Amino acid sequence: MADTYVGAIDQGTTGTRFMVFDHSGQVVANAYEKHEQIYPEPGWVEHDPVEIWENTQEVVTKGLADAGVGAEQLEALGITNQRETTIVWDKETGKPVHNALVWQDRRTTDRVEEIQEEDKVEWIRGKTGLECDAYFSATKTEWILDNAEPLKMQSSRGADLRERAEDGELLMGTIDAWLIYKLTGNHITDVSNASRTMLYNIHDMEWDDELLEEFGVPESMVPEVRPSSDESLYGHTDADGFLKEEVPVAGALGDQQAALFGQTCFDKGDAKNTYGTGAFYLMNTGSEAVASDNGLLTTVGFQMSGEPVQYALEGSIFIAGAAIEWLEDVDLINNAAQTAELARSVESTDGVYMVPAFTGLGAPHWDGRARGTIVGMTRGTRKEHIVRATLESIAYQTRDLAEAMEEDSGVEMTTLRVDGGAVKNNFLCQLQSDIIQTDIARPQVDETTALGSAYAAGLAVGYWDTVDELRDNWQVDEEFSPEMDAGKADKMYARWDDAVDRSRDWAQEE
């Protein structure tokens, strides 16, 4: 009998990856395709959902072919995705009515400020655990319904999108729901993605009627919410579709929750930080939804079939790896691999601080009008100093979150598990350990996001029996311990606070 595997579709901000894992959690196949970033106006970011679906089919087909694995050898498919990014599509045709509004998109900042002025921020936080921000799906869905050009279709000539939504002709969802719909024909999301919409009550674990009304989203538009690892399955791929097989689709997690799962952070107090486009620090808080006094989000971590939901505290940094991309954009570096070498070539930043608030600041500051800032430059400043300051900014932002996390949870962290593209950079890992004065553990399989969704899907179909099997799979690649004096780290971090202050509240309304 041929070996069997679990597949994972990892639909990220910059591209789509398909990976296949074996029983020991090792990578068998890996294919990747970038998609276009669309910037119609400053602060606006869109993706084409059709391109994403086409790329998904392409990477799945290519990944299987390259590894010599047949679709019939897949016991299950899991999905993980960039969270909050929002799509509205036509129920009948399956066609999007507008490009996806990406999580980084700031076009609804004015609407968020309106909500703040109406004193509804605490009301929203109480229900959703979220800070009221343009980051989440609620204001994005509202914007699409109010502003997208209606599709000129026979059935809807003259009818605007709001009317069509009220008539039950439109569906909305985050990327996981879009992919599950395209793969299985079912309109389903998981608890972790639902918890990021700002429309879902994380205490009652259901769509919140008052929030749906506040943002003008009819209940007929929202997907059914299921566990992240679902024994009753989200559906099967179509035997007549691109895979030519009925593969169970059984697991879904927003990317950061998937990384928490993939890092086997199954117990209260376990924490991980993922360094991708942004950086996302999550701590499992068990069956208690811990409210934050420090600008962190209370969110759903994950849920397995028949088990209580596990909550998490989350700190979201909007720009981490994207700050390194910016160094490339402005020709300070040729590629990301150069950053460590350049940063090491100088002993310090020579007083330069870089605050990468290109799309505002996330936790714990939540300032949508903050903008990217470099301070402390002199005529002696060289590009090496700016590169080093950029890497340091990632470490400082993480310390912002680590301190908030310890204060809210009362749990002192001993080791932080890290993953994501940027952790291949040893210089950054060591710097991170120095700045937060904590041990850093990097696992052997660094694509933990895809691994987490594969684990969720595999558990649902019995490919793995228990989470203990998954814990045994987790292997450390390298550990980093603080080498910097704590006093020096504190001093450097205090100046970071000053630099952040200078970036705040910069963007003006036109």
From Swiss-Prot:
Taxonomic path: Archaea, Methanobacteriati, Methanobacteriota, Stenosarchaea group, Halobacteria
Swiss-Prot/TrEMBL keywords: ATP-binding, Glycerol metabolism, Kinase, Nucleotide-binding, Transferase
Stored Gene3D superfamilies: 3.30.420.40
MF term (GO), any: glycerol kinase activity
GO cellular component: cytosol
Pfam families hit by this protein: FGGY_C (PF02782), FGGY_N (PF00370)
Keyword Kinase: yes
HAMAP family listed in its UniProt record: Glycerol_kin
Purpose: Key enzyme in the regulation of glycerol uptake and metabolism. Catalyzes the phosphorylation of glycerol to yield sn-glycerol 3-phosphate.
Entry-linked SUPFAM superfamilies: Actin-like ATPase domain (SSF53067)
Organism: Haloarcula marismortui (strain ATCC 43049 / DSM 3752 / JCM 8966 / VKM B-1809) (Halobacterium marismortui)
CDD domains: ASKHA_NBD_FGGY_GK
GO BP: glycerol catabolic process; glycerol metabolic process; glycerol-3-phosphate metabolic process
Protein name: Glycerol kinase
Reactions mediated catalytically: glycerol + ATP = sn-glycerol 3-phosphate + ADP + H(+)
Residues involved in glycerol binding: 83-84, 135, 255-256
The keyword Transferase is annotated on this UniProt entry: yes
Chain residues that bind ADP: 13, 17, 277, 321, 421, 425
Family that this chain belongs to: Belongs to the FGGY kinase family.
Top-level class of the enzyme under EC nomenclature: transferase
Enzyme Commission designation: 2.7.1.30
Record pathway: Polyol metabolism; glycerol degradation via glycerol kinase pathway; sn-glycerol 3-phosphate from glycerol: step 1/1
Residues where sn-glycerol 3-phosphate binds: 13, 83-84, 135, 255
Residues that bind ATP: 13-14, 277, 321, 421
Gene that this polypeptide is encoded by: glpK
